[in-house]
């Protein structure tokens, strides 16, 4: 049985403020976690307001069951299916705001039974939803050396990806890796250079977790789904925690904030330009955590909040 691990919500007030809440609006918390953002949103909604939360983690669903509020509902599933959920509910283009708090939550990191962290020993799992897909141990056991190296390099920007991948494959031939501390020790031994103030396994654990959970694909699909869901002037508020996530969010907002990409000098009338489709989002800027929040919650250090608004078409 896992302990009741606490979660400090990062950029709580800023992310919710980015939604520009209306008391009677319909909102989505795409990453319920332990409900920090959801509870703040509910506290600012009126009797006619509505909040729909989403999470694929069974422990998050259990936490959501503790919220006894007729304005609140929870969907057990990936946020990548956001467009499907709103279409099934007849809410396409009717959502007034969507909040996404990306990455792994503190309770997931701190619970050794989930296998996300090497700080405490646990089974080498790393799945957001333990009932679906391969665990990290299962994938590492069957993956080719080149595939492991590609994952470590692509999703962890690990400079010693090939050396670490070779060590993993060689170890699995004799004694399969099954524990987080085993993998962390192996990575440390395989790394010829140690970064100051950073465990050698940090990048590899991030990379494997992202791959196991298809995190970047999930984010991309969720962002595309937001365009289907949001009403005109609806807000998108997204918190990311590492450069790969933030780069993806930044690129998405920039892409949909541009008008039609027409070659210079092409003779088109105003009506023809309109037919090409105008921008769909307006970027409203980004926020970083303040010094006090970083001191209170060191995990907030790398977080970035980006906010955008849906443009009527």
From Swiss-Prot:
Its main location: cytoplasm. Pfam families: Methyltransf_5. Its EC number is 2.1.1.199. One of its GO terms (cellular component) is cytoplasm. Keywords: Cytoplasm, Methyltransferase, rRNA processing, S-adenosyl-L-methionine, Transferase. It is an enzyme of class 2 (transferase). It comes from the Bacteria. Signal peptide: none annotated. It catalyses: cytidine(1402) in 16S rRNA + S-adenosyl-L-methionine = N(4)-methylcytidine(1402) in 16S rRNA + S-adenosyl-L-homocysteine + H(+). One of its GO terms (molecular function) is rRNA (cytosine-N4-)-methyltransferase activity. Specifically methylates the N4 position of cytidine in position 1402 (C1402) of 16S rRNA. This is Ribosomal RNA small subunit methyltransferase H. It comes from Edwardsiella ictaluri (strain 93-146).
């Amino acid at each position: 049985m896992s302990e009741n691990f606490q979660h400090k919500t990062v950029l709580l007030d800023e992310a919710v403020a980015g939604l520009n809440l209306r008391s009677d609006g319909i909102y989505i918390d795409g990453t319920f976690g332990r409900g920090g953002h959801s509870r703040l949103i509910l506290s600012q909604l009126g009797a006619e307001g509505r909040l729909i939360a989403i999470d694929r983690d069974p422990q998050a669903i259990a936490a959501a069951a503790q919220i006894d509020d007729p304005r609140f509902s929870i969907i057990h599933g990936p946020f990548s299916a956001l467009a499907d959920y709103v279409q099934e509910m007849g809410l396409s283009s009717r959502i007034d705001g969507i909040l996404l708090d990306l990455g792994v939550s503190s309770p997931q990191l701190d619970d050794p039974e989930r296998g996300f962290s090497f700080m405490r020993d646990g089974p080498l799992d790393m799945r957001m939803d333990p009932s679906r897909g391969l665990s990290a141990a299962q994938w590492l056991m069957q993956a080719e050396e080149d595939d492991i190296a590609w994952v470590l390099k692509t999703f962890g920007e690990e400079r010693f990806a090939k050396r670490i991948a070779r060590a993993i494959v060689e170890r699995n031939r004799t004694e399969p890796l099954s524990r987080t501390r085993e993998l962390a020790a192996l990575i440390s031994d395989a790394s010829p250079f140690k970064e100051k103030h950073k465990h050698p396994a940090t990048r590899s654990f991030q990379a494997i977790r992202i791959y196991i959970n298809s995190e970047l694909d999930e984010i991309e699909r969720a962002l595309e789904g937001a365009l289907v869901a949001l009403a005109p002037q609806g807000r998108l508020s997204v918190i990311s925690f590492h450069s790969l996530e933030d780069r993806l969010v930044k690129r998405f907002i920039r892409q949909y904030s541009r008008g039609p990409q027409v070659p210079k000098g092409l003779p088109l009338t105003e009506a023809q330009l309109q037919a090409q489709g105008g921008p769909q989002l307006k970027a409203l800027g980004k926020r970083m955590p303040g010094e006090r929040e970083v001191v209170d919650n060191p995990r907030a250090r790398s977080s970035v909040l980006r906010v955008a608004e849906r443009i009527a078409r």
